[in-house]
Regions:
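Short, structured beta/alpha segment
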Residues: 1-90, 261
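Short gly/ser/thr-rich secondary-structure transition/capping motifs
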Residues: 120-127, 200-201, 266-267
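A structured beta-alpha segment of the ubiquitous adenosine-cofactor-binding alpha/beta core
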Residues: 129-130, 198-217
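Conserved small-residue-rich beta-alpha loop and adjacent elements
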Residues: 121-194, 217, 239, 261
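Short beta->alpha connector loops at strand-helix junctions that form conserved
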Residues: 165, 170-172, 200, 222, ...
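Long amphipathic alpha-helix in the N-terminal Rossmann-like dinucleotide-binding domain
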Residues: 49, 71-82, 96-120
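Residue-level signal for inorganic ion chemistry
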Residues: 30, 66, 88, 111, ...
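ALDH superfamily catalytic-core signature
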Residues: 226-301
Length: 301
C-alpha cells in the first residue's frame, strides 16, 4: 500500500495534528491502495501562518527568480511523469496512457507557460491617464476537485508562484497523491519554505477553516455549486477575494438541416471524455423535432 504519513507545511514534512489517516480506493478495482493524513483546523492554521511569513520575501523576489524555480519544478515533474501517471491512474481508475497524456503532460506544459508569464508582474502600463501596477494578492487558499487532480493544482498554484503569491492547497480527499509528489518536487528544487503548503483531509473538516482564516487573502475553489456557496459565506467575513468554478450546463445545439449523424457522434464522444466528469462537459442536446428520431438512433448506435 502507498503511504504518505505527513503533510507539507513551512518547507517541512510534519504529522497531521489529528494523528488520523484516510484510505484511498482504486475505483477500477474497488481495492484500497493508499493512505494519507487527515488534517485538522490546527494544521490549516499552521500552514496559513507559514504562507503569511513567506509572503513578504517571496513577493519581493524577481520574475527571473520565480521563473527559474518554476522551470526547475517542471523539469522534476517531467522526470517523474511515469510515477505521476501511475498514481493518478490508481486514484481515478483511468488508463495509464490517458493519465500521462491528459492528466500529467498537459499540466506540466501549463506550468511552464505560467513561468514564462512571471515577467508580466513587473510591467507597468498607462491606461486612461492612470498608471497600472500589478501586485501579488497575498496568501491564497486553493481547494481542488478530483476529476483533474494535477491540472487543477497547476491551474491555481502555478499563477500564484509566478505572481509572487504564497499558497495553501487542500486537494480532493479522493485524489491527493500527485499533490504529494508536487510538494516533494517543490522542496527538492529549493522553493522557499512556506511558499507552498499542502494539507490533506475532508473538506467538511478543514474547508471552512481554510476559507474563513483571517490571514488568507484569496480563496479559489473548483467544485459543486452547493459547496461554493458555503465557501463564499465563510470567506465573506474577511471580505476576501473569491474565485470559483462551479457546476454548469453545456447544451449542444444541432441546427435544422445540419449533418445529424456527424453532430451526434461528436457529442457522444465528447460527453464521454474523462468519463463525463468535466464542468464544461456537454450535458444535453437540442435538436429540431424533425430530426429527433434520427438523432436518437445515431446516439444509440
Amino acid at each position: 500500500m502507498i503511504q504518505y504519513d505527513k503533510i507539507f507545511i513551512d518547507g517541512r514534512w510534519v504529522p497531521a495534528s489529528s494523528g488520523e489517516f484516510s484510505t484511498l480506493v482504486n475505483p477500477a478495482t474497488e481495492e484500497p491502495f493508499a493512505r494519507v493524513p487527515s488534517a485538522f483546523p490546527a494544521d490549516v492554521d499552521a500552514a496559513v501562518q507559514a504562507a503569511r511569513r513567506a509572503f513578504g520575501p517571496w513577493s519581493r523576489s524577481t520574475a527571473a527568480e520565480r521563473k527559474e524555480l518554476i522551470d526547475a519544478i517542471c523539469a522534476r515533474l517531467t522526470e517523474r511523469s511515469d510515477e505521476l501517471a501511475s498514481l493518478i491512474s490508481q486514484e481515478m481508475g483511468i488508463p495509464v496512457h490517458f493519465a500521462k497524456g491528459i492528466q500529467v503532460n498537459g499540466p506540466i506544459q501549463g506550468l511552464s507557460i505560467f513561468g514564462n508569464l512571471a515577467h508580466t508582474m513587473e510591467e507597468e502600463r498607462e491606461e486612461n491617464g492612470y498608471l497600472v501596477v500589478r501586485e501579488p494578492i497575498g496568501v491564497c487558499a486553493f481547494i481542488t476537485p478530483w476529476n483533474f487532480p494535477l491540472f487543477q493544482v497547476i491551474a491555481k498554484v502555478g499563477p500564484a508562484l509566478a505572481s509572487g503569491c504564497t499558497s495553501v492547497l487542500k486537494p480532493s480527499e479522493q485524489t491527493p497523491l500527485s499533490c504529494f509528489v508536487f510538494a516533494e518536487v517543490c522542496a527538492q528544487v529549493g522553493l522557499p519554505a512556506g511558499v507552498f503548503n499542502l494539507v490533506t483531509g475532508k473538506g467538511s473538516v478543514i474547508g471552512e477553516a481554510l476559507s474563513s482564516h483571517p490571514e488568507v487573502d484569496m480563496v479559489s475553489f473548483t467544485g459543486s455549486t452547493e459547496v461554493g456557496v458555503e465557501i463564499a459565506r465563510a470567506a465573506a467575513g474577511g471580505v476576501k477575494r473569491v474565485c470559483q468554478e462551479l457546476g454548469g450546463k453545456s447544451p449542444f445545439v444541432v441546427a435544422p438541416g445540419a449533418n445529424v449523424a456527424k453532430a451526434i457522434k461528436y457529442v457522444v464522444k465528447d460527453s464521454m471524455f474523462n468519463s463525463g466528469q468535466m464542468c464544461v462537459q456537454l450535458s444535453r442536446i437540442l435538436v429540431h423535432e424533425d430530426q429527433y428520431e434520427e438523432a436518437v438512433e445515431v446516439a444509440r448506435t
